[in-house]
Structure formats: C-alpha cells, structure tokens
C-alpha cells in the first residue's frame, strides 16, 4: 500500500511538473509588447533613442503626411519638435518609405530598427501608419501622453519586423443609443482603435432607447426621439448634429478607420416611432424605451409612409459617410404587431 501511494504521488508530481513547464519558458519577445502580435519579429542587440535632434525622413508626400501626424503625437509627450526632412537622412532618424516591391499586402509594412536608424517601409500610407503605430508601442507607454512627460528615456529595442493583418475587416460596434457618448469621448476611442490597427468603426445610431443622429427632414427624431425619462424622472438624451458626424468621420479617416453607420430597422425603432407614431401599426403615442429587452412596437411594414420615411432618412445619412457599407440592423423584430395589422397582412398576401 505504501509503495502504491509513493507511485501515485510520483506520477502526480510528474504530471504537475509537465503542466507547469510551459509557464517557465521565455515569454514571446520578453519586454516587447506589440498588439496585435506582428507576423514576424526578431529582437536584435541594442536600442534606438529618440532625442530632440531626431528627424523624420519622408520619401513621398504621403509619407510626409504620416510623419506630420506622428511628429505631433511625439511632441505632445516628449516636448521634442522633430523636424521632417524630404532629403534622405542616414542616422538619428525615422525613415518612412513607400516601396511597391515589398512582399506584404496594402496594410502591411516592415520595420527595421538599429541603434542609428529606424526604417519603416510599406506599399501605402496606411501601411506606414500601422508601422508607426508599432513604433509607438515599442517606445515607453508614456509616449501616448497628451502632456509632456519628463525623465523618460525614449528608447525602443532594435528589432526587425515584417507584418500585415490576417483579417481585412477588424472592427468594433459602438452603441451610443442606450448610453450617449459625446464626440470627444468617441475621438479618444478612435485613437485607441488606431493604436491597435482596428480599421472599421460600426456606429449604432438608432435604437428603442434613443435616436442619435440629426435628420433635417424629420426634426422630431431628435427633438423627441433622442430623449427619454429615466427611472428617477430625469430627462436623459443627446444626439449628434450632421456637422459633428462629419467631424467624427474626418477624425476616423485621418486614422485609416472607416465609419459604418447603422440605422436600425425594422425593429429597435421605438425612438423613431415615439417621434412619428404614424410609422407604427397602431399609431399610439409612445415614448423611447427606458429598459432593455425587445420592443414589440416596430416599423409598420404595411404603410407606404414607412418606406418613404426610411428612404428620406437614408438619403440624408449616406452622404455623411463615404465608406462602402451602410448597416440596416435587421435583428430582433417581433412579428406581433404585423400579425394583427390589416395593412401588413395585405402586403404579405400581395407580395
């Protein structure tokens, strides 16, 4: 029995040791934290130091635009006003080069950092932008500060990186309908998305709980539909003017982020119906929803007014967003009202 116990204990210890051993291995490029993980990264000896005399070298006007963007960011945290040269610089410089012969896709780049020069190459300005975002992550985290930070050695490790995204679409969806998010906060989020090379921003602009985009042809959408009374009797609301929408889109575009607007239909439409009751099957007087869940009152599919309204709204929204996609929701639409609505039933029979 004693022998059996010792054998079992030994086996258990061996199993435990085998489970533990991976955690004792050297972490991926210890001390280098780049998100997302580059396709290939080799850490070399030494480091490159950014100083007040460091320059950007921009090989093309596109590269100069990227250099200008990041020179401003670097100045915010370091206080260094880095010069941008259109003539080749061989040392103490960050070189941004367009190279159509690179074996990467249009969002890919290479980054080669020695103790004298950082060279970033890409086929496009977008690739250079992502290469610079990697460089920013290689520097101390304080580089993202919006105020000058003193006492920091602005160094990055000597590395050789080749990178391109695995997925063409890399996005998030933001819902400012249930909880309104001011423009300045959205800009901060876009900055973070750009840092992590996210390229799609899905903006959920309408919901049961609030309509958040100005539509000039239908002013009640924001006069009524953007506001709700919370459980304590306090009015809660907010919306984006069309000028603010343009401002956010321009801000995102400058960070190579495409903005996809969403006008939810045929469900999740109580805020719009509260503003224009004739858009529903019952035409009752309603208010934007103050709780979560699925609302039974949806756009009436039997009324021509509904389709005219949606066409008008989309006609105003589309020009504000130059991207390829327009999102119309389509989820969670109860059929309760349609089943009892003569106009909806008539349309169903005829189509």
Regions picked out by a protein language model, each given a short descriptive name:
Residues 20-34, 309-330:
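Charged, low-complexity intrinsically disordered tails and linkers
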Residues 102-325, 341:
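Feature activates predominantly on carbohydrate-active enzymes
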Residues 2-9:
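Sec-dependent signal peptide recognition
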